[in-house]
């Protein structure tokens, strides 16, 4: 390496590393990069330094990244390493085994967006499939402190409206820092409290810029939401940031706004991964919120009197859209998160849950979670309308009874009634065999009680 460094100028080194980064995007053409220390290479390259780097493998790259005085050379090497760690998981353990996580933690103390992005990304990738000691990095290398300080730097920048030109690396660096914090708090829960000071910074960053109409949860909003999920929201320091005394509903209103826009903007393929964390965060916020905030969340997320003008889940309000997705077959995690949130908003009371969303939406959740269906559930419930008047509600659909509309279908003929009775008989028998519920076929019950009379084929009903 010394000979190569002596014979190559800084620009030559950087050009070689840039070329290596391009080769490194395809593992098929760059196996030597992904080894710890390669002796020879068949790579056909003209640059002698490029050949030296390939021969030495990732060991040489780590030296360039961490033991050079040129920041430009170090960043070029870090980009190659980051690509290698992304494409070849075995290189992550090489990075850890050689003791570089501690050095990377030290490098997080920076005021350069490129450095923050690269070191955060490499540490983030090293949390997968390695024996990295995150606890030691937090205790001995100030990992949590550096992450929190970097988040604070993003707050101190001018807002969108004040910036003349946005630096794309600033946003990318923020995203990698948030992803790193999420993984560290996920894999090292014992040291979660070290990141509590980050809550106030994350809250501030929620207002750093406006979300887009097409993708309201694109970075930084999705990473900001995700990062809060693993933090201690019960801590006094967190409570002051999440429910400020002068406006306790401020944060939850922001998250509700993101949910309202996000659940409408994304296709079914993206709902599961993008929107589910927002719903999960609202559950955590509700769990730790003061009474005033809880009440506001209930008013925003539970069906209103206006929603009950029709069968619940058929309108365009946020509660209606949530109910629709609570039975979404293509997004199982989202539908479970929504049902749990609505159950929490119902004070985890099965009777209130049925009253709020209707038995049609509540039954599946109650059954899956072994929550007994309330025995006192009456055939009709009542709830307040927009003016506060109590009106009877269909317990299955959640709609006001006086708003129900029935189709003007002609009365069934005797033959149609017989076919329908036979169909119901078969369905009851199938249901009984499943063992899911203990039910008796009404025809069988009628026979046992002597209320069933078999008529002859020539029977004619006499009319008065």
Q: Which residues make up each language-model segment?
A:
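Eukaryotic scaffolding regions of large macromolecular assemblies
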Residues: 233-404
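Acidic, Ser/Thr- and Gly/Pro-rich intrinsically disordered linkers and low-complexity segments
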Residues: 1-3, 149-172, 206-217, 256-273, ...
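Intrinsic disorder
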Residues: 7-10, 68-71, 113, 168-171, ...
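Intrinsically disordered, low-complexity regulatory regions
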Residues: 1-4, 8, 14-20, 348-350, ...
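Amphipathic alpha-helical segments within extended alpha-helical solenoids and repeat-rich scaffolds
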Residues: 32, 39-46, 50-54, 58-65, ...
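Extended HEAT/HEAT-like alpha-solenoid repeat tracts in very large eukaryotic scaffold/adaptor proteins
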Residues: 12-19, 77-80, 118-122, 166-184, ...
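Residue-level signature of the C-terminal ends
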Residues: 23-27, 45, 84-88, 98, ...
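Elongated alpha-helical scaffolds that mediate protein-protein interactions in large eukaryotic proteins
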Residues: 1-118, 125-149, 163-170, 186-197, ...
